[in-house]
Amino acid sequence: MDNHNLRMRLMLEAEKEIVEGLTETERYRYFLGRMQFLKYESGKENLTSSDCSGSVCLALLLATGCAIRVTADSLYRKYFTKKNPDKNDIQAAFFITLYDRKLGSRVYKENEVCHVAGLCGRDVVLNCVEPYSELRSLSDMKPYYQANDYRIVVRGLDRESLQKASDDNVDLFGADYQFEQIRNAIDGARG
């Protein structure tokens, strides 16, 4: 085992003790909160840098042990499908464009999810945008996004879909090396 992987396992063991008595939802919220001030980096999902969907996928991995790495749109369409989530469900807020638009180098189509923010408290989300992620009030974010022609939807996680995708080892598009190390450390900790 290399030194970096050992450090990762030791860190995860310490975190495991902290979250030991928490539910999966509480762990998800905890790990989202711990990700405040991560550097924003497109295509990343690790403990030093992440993009919006990467932060949600990493929180899911740390909270549930289930590994997926997908876009915000795929999270919305495949995994966060509960339209009326219970307060104890793992939840995320999705920002859906009302028309075709270009953001950076990517063109998003009408009704495609352009952004996701994991809910880590009542009306509190981890908003992972440049230059770094921060905890924000969803109520404070809504007027800006609505004025810029986005629809905001909060959905709950379909835990069975997440488990099946993880068990089948699907939906891991382009997971970065650090995400894989975390996944391997979690799998190693399980035995």
Labelled PLM ranges:
Residues 13-78:
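Secreted/periplasmic proteins that engage bacterial cell-wall peptidoglycan
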